[in-house]
Structure formats: structure tokens, C-alpha cells
Amino acid sequence: MASSNLIKQLQERGLIAQVTDEEALAERLAQGPIALYCGFDPTADSLHLGHLVPLLCLKRFQLSGHKPVALVGGATGLIGDPSFKATERKLNTSETVGEWVEKIRRQVSPFLDFDCGKNSAIAANNYDWFGNMNVLDFLRDIGKHFSVNQMISKEAVKQRLNRDDVGISFTEFSYNLLQGYDFASLNKQHDVELQIGGSDQWGNITSGIDLTRRMNQKQVYGLTVPLITKSDGTKFGKTEGGAIWLDASKTSPYKFYQFWINTADADVYRFLKFFTFMSLENIDALEEEDKNSGKAPRAQYVLAEDVTRMVHGEAGLEAARRITQSLFSGALQDMTQDDFAQLAQDGMPIIELENSADLQQALVSAELVPSRGQARTMISSNAVTINGEKQANPEYIFSASDRLFDRYTLLRRGKKHYCLICWKA
């Protein structure tokens, strides 16, 4: 992605929501590499899919020769960003936030290159400059540059200010000053000239631009990526089970892969532009191929494989593929113990049973049927499989050979209704 027309290429991919002084930024990028940053607050012990677009945007800039700074908010995470939030955030302990900072730092690292010469990435933590700052310095050196009149007019906090039942605390109200100072501090330390973030960060970004101009007498820029929505208007990155996390212990690679496989046709080519590094020409060619093939589209598989590989590595992708293929074919011999652990984590409904359980009881406990009578009917009609093998004996009692890895049994009714039995020790 050539640096000289990077802004234009990001726009063509639909990756720019707002940008300050677009013409001046494009000119600055044409002059040579810049340093830019994106902040990630530790509001949980993992990033989620909503963080992926700005994180990949950092990577796009680095691939074009620019120097990315990944800022983890060890200080701002203690305060909480009120932007477009209906209620006050719960304040977490400094110990908890410190642990989350390290987890998120490790999570961000594989996406960027920290050893590639002049544009090697930098990892930063804003606790480094806020941790020892006293309140008088904060008010005198930072607070004096902020107009309360302007702060209360920002869209990000307006809804809270207009509500009598919730309001906004001074703690959260001060967040805007903290993030603004991040920009000024990074500009001074690393000559950072651009901040990128989600579209909900526009107010915080413009505050940082103004503060940097006042404190450092430097012109800097801001760019936001759009809030990703699905074509049906629902939130992207959420399932009935909650958020899709980047941490494999919170969302398994299998579930992560399946999330992308289930992308709607109306969204998939747009998501390829947002979440992969495929060229626009190749995405357009894939869309044309899918339209004319008369078969199920390939795009979802391309998307799922690219993003799963990027987040979980080749081993994570292979496991997700292996589980998917095994469940589709009913042949479980290729599945590993770790694969079954992924299914038990979040891949399908699970139940725990005693070793003496029979098949009828298992079907009822798994809520695959409402009653033992219905279970008998289903079993007798060859609609039930155990570990991929049909079982037609309604009086069947599980044996040791049914317990894969001495722990798991996969139960299926019909073609799509699964349950994983985890046998009690």
C-alpha cells in the first residue's frame, strides 16, 4: 500500500469515517514516513472484534513505511471513557488493570513488527507519564488548556449531561483531558503526528490535536475508522453468547472461525475489505466468481481463514478447520483432545453425566428431545448418532468405548442438533 495515496486507498476500503484536514494529512504522508498511534484501554482482560479494525489500520500504516505506536491505557483504564456510554463504568482495581495491561500488550504485539528498522513499532503505556503526576501539575499544565464550554458541547458526553438520572462524574469527565495529553506526550516523546481510533473517539482525538498544538506548537492529525455494522442493522462482533474476543481462552479458535463462516452474503465482501489485506481487485474478482459459480460462495471461507490465521496463527486455524470438517463428516478420528476442549469451551451445548447414564437420559438432559418417549422414537428412527455412528437401540447404555479421551462423547440428533457429553470423573 503506497504511502503517497494511503488515505485514498483506505477510503476505497471504507476504512475512514472522519479525518481532520484530509488534504494536509495527505500532503504530509506524501512527504515521508510519520509516527502514529492508537490507544487500547484495558477495560477487560482481552481485546474483542471491535478493536480489530483500528489495530489492523495501524498495521496498514506500518506496511506503508510508517511507525506505529500501540498505546495501552494503564492510566486511562483506571478512569473509564464515558464516550457514548449510557452509564458510569465500573472502576476496576489498579491490580486488575495492571494485569489486563500486560495481557493486552501481549495480544497486540503479534500484529505489528517491533524489529524492522526505522519504522519498528513501539509499545507504550500512558501510566508512565500519568503515574507520578500530581493533581496540581495536572490542573495547571493540562487543565488550563481545556474549555469546559467546549467539553460539554461534545456529542460523546451530551447524552449523559442531559440525563438527570445518570449524569457524569468528574472522574469520567476528566477522561477527555487524559487522552488529549496522551497525544501531546507521544508527540513530544516519539514525534507522533497522527492518532487513529474508532469513530466514537472523535471528540477525544480532536481534543488531543488542540492540546498538542497549544503545548508543543505542532500540527497533528486525527483519523477515525467507522463503527462496523451488519447489513441487517445489528451490532457487529456480538453473538447470543456475548462478545467475540481475540483471546483463545475467552472465544475458542473454532467459535471465532465459525463466526466468520456465518457472515451474511450481504456483508462478506465489505468485511474482506475491513479485516483482510486482500487487494480490492482480488476481492472484486472473488465476488464476481461467487456470483457466477452457481455454488455456495467461497468468500466466507476466505474471510474466516484469513482472520483466524491472523488472530490465532496457523495452528489455531488448522484446529478450527479440523473440528469443522469432523463435525460435518461425522468422522471424529482426526480430532485431538484440545479440539474437544474447544467444543466444551464454547463450541456447542454441553452436559455433564455420570458414567451409568443411558442414551435416552442423555438426549433428555441435553434437551435434544423433551421426553424419554420422544427419545425412544428418535433413536428407533435412526435419527441419533454417538460420535458420528448411528445408534438404533433405544435401550442403549454408554460404554467406556464411547468416551473419547476418557472424557467426551459427541451426541447428535438429526443433522444439526449437537451436544457434547463431558463425563464426570
Swiss-Prot record:
Pfam families: SYY_C-terminal, tRNA-synt_1b. One of its GO terms (biological process) is tyrosyl-tRNA aminoacylation. Belongs to the class-I aminoacyl-tRNA synthetase family. TyrS type 1 subfamily. A motif ('HIGH' region) lies at residues 42-51. Homodimer. This is Tyrosine--tRNA ligase. Residues 357-414 form the S4 RNA-binding domain. It is found in: Cytoplasm. SMART domains: S4 (SM00363). SUPFAM superfamilies: Alpha-L RNA-binding motif, Nucleotidylyl transferase. Keywords: Aminoacyl-tRNA synthetase, ATP-binding, Cytoplasm, Ligase, Nucleotide-binding, Protein biosynthesis, RNA-binding. It comes from Pectobacterium atrosepticum (strain SCRI 1043 / ATCC BAA-672). GO terms for molecular function: ATP binding; RNA binding; tyrosine-tRNA ligase activity. L-tyrosine binds at residues 37, 175, 179.
